Amino acid sequence: MLKMNLGDTELIVATCRKYNLTAFETAYVLATAYHETAHTMKPIMELGGTTYLKGKKYWPYVGRGYVQLTWKENYIKAGKKLGVDFVDNPGLLMEAKYAAPILVLGMKEG
């Protein structure tokens, strides 16, 4: 059972409300974040370590945040939605204030 005090659950729910998601959509967002963050409900970086990640074709745009956003194109798209340069500052995706709307808007709008 997901606890509301686990990690950033309350922030994610508040972000879902801000963008008018239904209860069913919010449940889906929470379940996705729970799975993608290894049950922490905190932004995480793709597992594997730097040496492993540098071998990925999408380096340095590796999975970050609540949904493990990857690839430069997706960093650009998320940046345009939020008005933030994630391409030059990929580490910002580890901040909840950016990771939450990326999670919610990405699932709502694609």
Regions found by a protein language model. Name each.
Residues 1-11, 23-109:
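Peptidoglycan-targeting cell-wall enzymes and recognition modules
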Residues 15-18:
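Extended, non-catalytic subsegments within catalytic or DNA/protein-binding/adaptor domains
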